[in-house]
Amino acid sequence: MNKIILLLMFCGLPALAGCTSEKAKAAFTLDTAPLTTKNVDAVKGQRATCAGPAVKTFNLEAIETNVNLGMGISFAAWTYNGRIPAPIIEACEGDKVVINMTNKGTTAHGFDTHAMKIDARHYSPVAPGKTMTIEKVVDTPGVFMYHCASGPVTDLHIKSGIHGAMIVYPHKGQLRPAREIVVVEDAVYGVRDDEGFIPGTDPQLAQKNEQAFSMFNGRMDNDAVRVNPGDLVRMYFVNVGPGVSSAHVIGTLFDRVYDGKEPIVGVQTYAVPAGSGVLLEFYIPEEGVYPFVDHDKLAFLPYGLSLAFATGNISAMAH
């Protein structure tokens, strides 16, 4: 892709949207190719999503299946559509979002999104073989978690892998050109056998928030995300838990953090509570490796809880 060096002039913004100012300038490379990891697809982005139909329908299936976590470890998980994390849901502010959730499992499952303002009774459990439909206009831009809703055992379902990220883009104001990626932090609560298989979530470990592994995007072995010096990376980040995630990129700062209407500028580490999402933007300042980590869980390095952004053919293990 051709790269054009631009001067971007920026100032305080409405929710998630960009504007310009002569007081602050930053050079960046206009490369907007989306970024991905093994378990997460590329986002469509604000422009394509908001140009689409005003009614957006998403079909989810609750599936109980074994998933590969990498590094020789597999897990008997509960999922949406057979994957951890679940498919990305993208909508535009003002869209009506329709969710059809079919339970193909052997126990009750459900659906709950933090992006909707709706009577909680709509999030009741769904029996095996049944389908629920939830529809609502989403009116608040942001990054949100969605997950299974199964009454008193909802926590166990979430910790078994049935969760995902939902993005609601602002209808007015364009986001800055950037390389976009979704990152979900989650954990596994179970004991693996001699062959590396974890036969489901251990309720006692889950109750105590004692995770065996913490991961980004459901993998212990994410490859380095390839970027270029000068790239602006926009990360739609969701923290499933447990506890607060201390989001940090080793080697650079967050240029902007969006966790409400106005951006926070020049942030070294940002606390994201369990069950919450945030938009994080950072530049790749020069050739090198820039690991994204949870600074509160460095004990889980290098097993899953590091996602390296690296330029060229530089080894992601350099740090």
Protein language model features and the residues they cover:
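Copper-binding active sites and cupredoxin-like electron-transfer domains
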Residues: 19-319
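Secretory targeting signatures
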Residues: 1-22
